[in-house]
């Protein structure tokens, strides 16, 4: 039943995303704009299903999880195996010095960390860095796994805690999964007769939303591996299209719970809106890091009335 539900949602979302891609490339601007907005939102659903598969809860069998995870990854596009390793590393490193994008440490230049936050999380470059990394692995896996890339280039781009682990994954598995993902994107481009401009602007719109969401659900939260996240308040339609991804604290506390159980696991901790966190990131940039274990900065997020 779980696999059937997620398969139906995956088919629906990938079909809707394809329709939005077509609309942006072929319709007048007053129809293309809603299609662009639709793609920005609906393309989060395949990613949410990929996220379920990464945790082994998209289906009740390992084979079912792997199959739906590989197909869901086509929409990003990425490799299921790459994403699984990267995301499980995130659960291990969350809010530690290895994975801290809203704060900067004493030995880190603030200007560089602001580039990572503004460029990566708020302007969508985080998504494109992942995409370019996937392309590099596909074209030149030896370069991706090289000492220079792992120890010099990846850390300079903010991926120093991830790439060393990713470079150890089986190359043929990653390459074959990326081949499927890139072929799917090429098929969409050809079959829907997409324009390059329309396709790229859709990717950028999705990048803006996806990149911001990846850290808005953590910024200024408790410096704690398991409890360092928020259950963000969003419109019901946004939460549904992302399959309750905004219930992120509940997910970190219960990573084996499927998406439809997360709302019942939301605790009584303060719940900022997505926009409250998002605009504080824009307004203030990175801030000096508190010690590991420090509580969420509620006075910063919810300033007292004067």
Q: What are the language-model segments listed below?
A:
Residues 58-78, 99-117, 225-239:
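Juxtamembrane helix-capping/reentrant segments at transmembrane boundaries
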Residues 54, 58-59, 225, 254, ...:
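Active-site-flanking alpha-helical
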Residues 53-54, 93, 220, 253:
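Active-site His/Glu-centered metal-binding helix of metallohydrolases
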Residues 1-41, 74-196, 256-306:
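Non-catalytic, topology-defining segments of multipass membrane proteins
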Residues 50-56, 87, 251:
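His-Asp-centered metal-binding catalytic motifs of divalent-metal-dependent phosphohydrolases/nucleases
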Residues 40-53, 79-83, 195, 199-224, ...:
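Transmembrane alpha-helical segments that form the membrane-embedded catalytic/substrate-channel core
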Residues 159-161, 232-247:
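Cytosolic juxtamembrane regulatory segments of multi-pass membrane proteins
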Residues 246-249, 255:
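C-terminal transmembrane module of eukaryotic multi-pass membrane proteins
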């Amino acid at each position: 039943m779980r696999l059937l539900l997620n398969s139906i949602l995956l088919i629906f979302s990938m079909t809707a995303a394809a329709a939005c891609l077509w609309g942006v490339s072929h319709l007048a601007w007053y129809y293309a704009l809603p299609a662009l907005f639709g793609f920005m939102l609906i393309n989060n659903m395949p990613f949410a299903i990929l996220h379920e598969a990464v945790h082994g809860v998209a289906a009740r069998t390992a084979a079912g999880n792997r199959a739906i995870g590989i197909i869901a990854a086509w929409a990003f596009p990425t490799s299921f195996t790459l994403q699984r390793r990267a995301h499980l590393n995130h659960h291990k490193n969350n809010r530690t010095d290895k994975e801290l994008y809203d704060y900067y440490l004493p030995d880190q230049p603030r200007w560089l960390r602001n580039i990572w936050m503004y460029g990566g999380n708020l302007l969508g470059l985080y998504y494109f860095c992942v995409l370019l990394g996937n392309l590099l692995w596909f074209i030149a896996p030896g370069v991706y796994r090289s000492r220079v890339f792992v120890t010099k280039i990846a850390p300079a781009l903010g991926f120093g805690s991830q790439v060393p682990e990713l470079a150890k994954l089986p190359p043929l598995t990653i390459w074959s999964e990326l081949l499927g993902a890139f072929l799917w994107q090429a098929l969409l481009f050809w079959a829907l007769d997409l324009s390059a401009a329309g396709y790229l602007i859709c990717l950028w719109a999705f990048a803006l939303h996806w990149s911001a969401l990846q850290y808005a659900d953590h910024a200024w939260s408790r410096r704690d591996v398991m409890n360092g996240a928020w259950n963000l308040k969003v419109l019901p339609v946004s939460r549904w299209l992302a399959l309750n991804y905004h219930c992120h604290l509940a997910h970190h506390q219960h990573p084996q719970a499927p998406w439809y159980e997360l709302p019942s696991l939301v605790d009584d901790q303060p719940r900022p809106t997505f926009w409250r966190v998002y605009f504080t990131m824009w307004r203030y940039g990175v801030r000096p890091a508190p010690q590991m274990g420090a509580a969420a900065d509620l006075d910063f997020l919810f300033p007292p009335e004067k």
